[in-house]
Amino acid sequence: MRIGVLTGGGDCPGLNAVIRAVVRTCHARYGSSVVGFQNGFRGLLENRRVQLHNDDRNDRLLAKGGTMLGTARVHPDKLRAGLPQIMQTLDDNGIDVLIPIGGEGTLTAASWLSEENVPVVGVPKTIDNDIDCTDVTFGHDTALTVATEAIDRLHSTAESHERVMLVEVMGRHAGWIALNAGLASGAHMTLIPEQPFDIEEVCRLVKGRFQRGDSHFICVVAEGAKPAPGTIMLREGGLDEFGHERFTGVAAQLAVEVEKRINKDVRVTVLGHIQRGGTPTAYDRVLATRFGVNAADAAHAGEYGQMVTLRGQDIGRVPLADAVRKLKLVPQSRYDDAAAFFG
């Protein structure tokens, strides 16, 4: 059997660990070969590929961030129009099963390819942790660790200068990074997309903390956080070429509004892409490896149109169509637990 693998969408710590596990499992357990398509689905459209080998180069991938295959986003319309070329590329390279590793967009494309009778097994990745039907995605733990360490450091400088610090983190429309980093770092408030915020409530908590004699205030702000209707208006960035919302720096805009209302120095730190880069944590390496092994097993078992998942401690599989039906967002109960520590 000949397996194809690609990484699509944004990069993420742990991608190389999945590739390594797929290659090792296919070679050692099944005697199959693996072809990597470069720069995601673009590699399928342009027939750009590389033979992957079970050797020292493959072993060294485990701790390496990013993706050795490269990654890119391809517009869904271009992908649909390119279906004949995709089928030709798979046929020319003798690919029996394709294993796409990616987030919402990549897995949606994989689900569509499955409907077009392409044998596909999906592997979920995203630092945002917003893929449904799996408890967690690899990459999230690394991003969470980076964010938490950064906020830990900001506590000391904010305390020294009696400042309000707004820390903007990634996550798009899901608040998992912000929520978990806020809890782990002892932040005094967390704003997430699932819970529109009231600027007056933010300022009330800030004032209350300083009135009690506390020396600083840390607020974690998810990049997709939005004000409640009828409160303040923030600048909107419109949509990009893929129909995704452009985020316009909510923390910086919020800082201006907070400074208007309280007599305190407000500073903003945007963590940005540092959350996506670098060496994956041990947890992400293990999870990514388990996902890769299970995806290779599913490919050889003929379980196509599936996505590998983590449920509890067990790796399983669910239909791709179920996994991409909706995003996994922060439930009210989880936010309520975090809110007990606000102020």
Curated annotation (Swiss-Prot):
Pathway: Carbohydrate degradation; glycolysis; D-glyceraldehyde 3-phosphate and glycerone phosphate from D-glucose: step 3/4. It comes from the Bacteria. Mg(2+) binds at residue 104. Keywords: Allosteric enzyme, ATP-binding, Cytoplasm, Glycolysis, Kinase, Magnesium, Metal-binding, Nucleotide-binding, Transferase. Substrate binds at residues 126-128, 163, 170-172, 223, 267, 273-276. Disulfide bonds: none annotated. Its EC number is 2.7.1.11, 2.7.1.144. It catalyses: beta-D-fructose 6-phosphate + ATP = beta-D-fructose 1,6-bisphosphate + ADP + H(+); D-tagatofuranose 6-phosphate + ATP = D-tagatofuranose 1,6-bisphosphate + ADP + H(+). One of its GO terms (biological process) is fructose 6-phosphate metabolic process. Gene3D superfamilies: 3.40.50.450, Phosphofructokinase domain. Its main location: cytoplasm. Inhibited by high concentrations of the substrates fructose 6-phosphate and ATP, and by the reaction products, fructose 1,6-bisphosphate and ADP. Allosterically inhibited by phosphoenolpyruvate (PEP), guanosine diphosphate (GDP) and citrate. SUPFAM superfamilies: Phosphofructokinase. It holds the Pfam family PFK. Homodimer or homotetramer. Activity of PfkA is tenfold higher than that of PfkB. Activity with tagatose-6-phosphate suggests that PfkA and/or PfkB may substitute for tagatose-6-phosphate kinase and further support glycolysis. Belongs to the phosphofructokinase type A (PFKA) family. Mixed-substrate PFK group III subfamily. This is ATP-dependent 6-phosphofructokinase.
